[in-house]
């Protein structure tokens, strides 16, 4: 076979014409130091704050400190395979996570990756975890109720859509249980729920997921889990990941609820990172920007105005106190950021009052505008009655000769305390709460022995559901107790009491 010279030149010519010079440029650096989830990297001069850097083995790191000759990086994974001198590549991307309906019913890590073994996520889009909170013009005042299913909260410290209500108390006082009840109460409301576990035991997170699954609530809930064994940067970023996913619904004109369990552990993780990054410590060794850590997170919970879709994001952050000290640094910070707090007390919990809510110290600063009128009508005097009861109960220990009025207040208070007790994972619809509290505050339970109050309440609600459903439906529909509803409710309670035996 003879090769012709012109053919060779033609082939070479074609090759030259079709040649594409592909040069892949990437700015790289070198690891100077690594340990405890933190790395110092030299040579990535143009790195941005919050940018992702790629380490060997596919581990990502997030730039936190921008210094003169190196950058401080928080590693979003294990630092076991990374050593001094390893190459580090810039990605040019800001840390983002998947959002959309694909995350519903899933258990994810703070990077937005599934850890439940149910396959990949079908994401609508990806969004940065750090997003600026809505401005003043974009917001609307809280005016719609967000029921929790707990009588003590819905009656006296009501929560509205778009509110930030702090759940604060010592360990083992039922903080998580209150929040899980709030999730279970959203079954009929169409609110999308997010539970962010920060620094929890893996067994605790598994128990939460199992509880939600058993009650049919996991299908509208997403769990973001940064457990105690995860590196500090993952515990720090988990809350922002959950918030970004929940904001998708707020910005789509829908409603979302997010629970941060708990922000005390997030602050501890942030303190650990800050000290390792050599940032100067302040009070209780926390860095100076620990207030901003929580304020920029909680300010993203909002009720947005009608022109932006009228969606909302409600936040229930949890803070764990030490021996009831609410004047410590982190508790006071979060109390000042939120729109009220529900204070849970160990003494009440141990006395069998569950949920163990201290009515005197709990407050909702904006929720009153969101409470349904029917509840306002029946529970208006409740807080005062309970406050007087607590005061008189302390004095009543000293003397037995009480006048009629004092005795009546003590009896009414004891019955109200009993009425506000509620079993775990049994949220109560608003119309049933109204009927139950109406019976107590209007004196229909005054002749019922204190130990029989809960049995009386359960039997009364069963009676109303079975024979006088029209009364419950009227309360649900009108959301106000007018003359007709009051007359029907009084008659129904009287009819029930005739057939009820203690």
From Swiss-Prot:
Reaction equations catalysed: ATP + H2O + 4 H(+)(in) = ADP + phosphate + 5 H(+)(out)
Which Gene Ontology CC terms are recorded? plasma membrane; proton-transporting ATP synthase complex
UniProt subcellular location: Cell inner membrane
**E.C. numbers:** 7.1.2.2
Q: Which residues bind ATP?
A: 169-176
Please name the CDD domains in this protein's record. ATP-synt_F1_alpha_C, ATP-synt_F1_alpha_N, F1-ATPase_alpha_CD
Highest taxon of the source? Bacteria
Q: Does the keyword Transcription regulation apply?
A: no
Q: How does it sit in the membrane?
A: Peripheral membrane protein
Q: Name one GO molecular function term.
A: ADP binding
- Which keywords accompany this UniProt record? ATP synthesis, ATP-binding, Cell inner membrane, Cell membrane, CF(1), Hydrogen ion transport, Ion transport, Membrane, Nucleotide-binding, Translocase, Transport
Give the residue spans that cross the bilayer: none
Q: Does the keyword Ribonucleoprotein apply?
A: no
User: Pfam families under this entry?
Assistant: ATP-synt_ab (PF00006), ATP-synt_ab_C (PF00306), ATP-synt_ab_N (PF02874)
Site feature Required for activity, where: 362
List, alphabetically, the NCBIfam families matched: atpA, PRK13343.1
Quaternary state and interactors: F-type ATPases have 2 components, CF(1) - the catalytic core - and CF(0) - the membrane proton channel. CF(1) has five subunits: alpha(3), beta(3), gamma(1), delta(1), epsilon(1). CF(0) has three main subunits: a(1), b(2) and c(9-12). The alpha and beta chains form an alternating ring which encloses part of the gamma chain. CF(1) is attached to CF(0) by a central stalk formed by the gamma and epsilon chains, while a peripheral stalk is formed by the delta and b chains.
> What the protein does?
Produces ATP from ADP in the presence of a proton gradient across the membrane. The alpha chain is a regulatory subunit.
Similarity-based family? Belongs to the ATPase alpha/beta chains family.
Quote the protein name from its UniProt record. ATP synthase subunit alpha
Q: Which organism is it from?
A: Desulfovibrio desulfuricans (strain ATCC 27774 / DSM 6949 / MB)
Encoding gene per record: atpA
């Amino acid at each position: 076979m003879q090769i012709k010279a012109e053919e060779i030149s033609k082939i070479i010519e074609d090759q030259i014409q079709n040649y594409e010079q592909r040069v892949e440029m990437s700015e790289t650096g070198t690891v100077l130091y690594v340990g405890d989830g933190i790395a110092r990297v030299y040579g990535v001069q143009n790195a941005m704050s919050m940018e992702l850097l790629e380490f060997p083995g596919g581990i990502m790191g997030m730039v936190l400190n921008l210094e003169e000759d190196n950058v401080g990086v928080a590693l979003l994974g294990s630092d076991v395979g990374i050593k001094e001198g390893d190459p580090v590549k810039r990605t040019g991307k800001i840390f983002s996570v998947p959002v959309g309906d694909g995350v519903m019913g899933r258990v994810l890590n703070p990077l937005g990756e599934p850890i439940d073994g149910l396959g990949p996520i079908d994401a609508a889009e990806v969004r940065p975890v750090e997003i600026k909170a809505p401005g003043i013009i974009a917001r609307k005042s809280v005016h719609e109720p967000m029921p929790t299913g707990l009588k003590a909260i819905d009656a006296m410290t009501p929560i509205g859509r778009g509110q930030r209500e702090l759940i604060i108390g010592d360990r083992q006082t039922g903080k998580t249980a209150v929040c899980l009840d709030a999730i279970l109460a959203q079954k009929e409301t169409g609110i999308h729920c997010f539970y962010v576990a920060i620094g929890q035991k893996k067994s605790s997170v598994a128990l939460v997921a199992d509880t939600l699954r058993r009650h049919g609530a996991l299908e509208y809930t997403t769990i973001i889990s940064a457990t105690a064994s995860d590196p500090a940067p993952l515990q720090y970023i988990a809350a922002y990941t959950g918030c970004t996913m929940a904001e998708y619904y707020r910005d789509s004109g829908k409603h979302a609820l997010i629970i941060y369990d708990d922000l005390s552990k997030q602050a501890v993780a942030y303190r650990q990172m800050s000290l390792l990054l050599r940032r100067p410590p302040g009070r209780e060794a926390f860095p100076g920007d620990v207030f901003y850590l929580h304020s920029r997170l909680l300010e993203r919970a909002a009720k947005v105005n009608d022109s932006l879709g009228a969606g909302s994001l409600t936040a229930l952050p949890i803070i764990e106190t030490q021996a009831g000290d609410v004047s410590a640094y982190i508790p006071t910070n979060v109390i000042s950021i939120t729109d009220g707090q529900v204070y849970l007390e160990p003494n009440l919990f141990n006395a069998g009052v569950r949920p163990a809510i201290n009515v005197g110290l709990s407050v909702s600063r904006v929720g009153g505008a969101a409470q349904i009128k029917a509840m306002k009508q029946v529970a208006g005097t409740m807080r005062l009655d309970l406050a007087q009861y607590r005061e008189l109960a302390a004095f009543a220990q000293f003397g037995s000769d009480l006048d009629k009025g004092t005795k009546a207040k003590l009896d009414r208070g004891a019955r109200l305390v009993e009425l506000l007790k509620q079993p775990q994972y049994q949220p109560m619809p608003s119309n049933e709460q109204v009927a139950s509290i109406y019976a107590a505050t209007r004196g229909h339970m005054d002749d019922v022995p204190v130990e029989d109050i809960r049995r009386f309440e359960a039997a009364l609600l069963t009676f109303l559901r079975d024979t006088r459903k029209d009364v419950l439906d009227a309360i649900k529909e009108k959301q106000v107790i007018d003359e007709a509803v009051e007359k029907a409710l009084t008659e129904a309670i009287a009819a029930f009491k005739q057939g009820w035996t203690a």
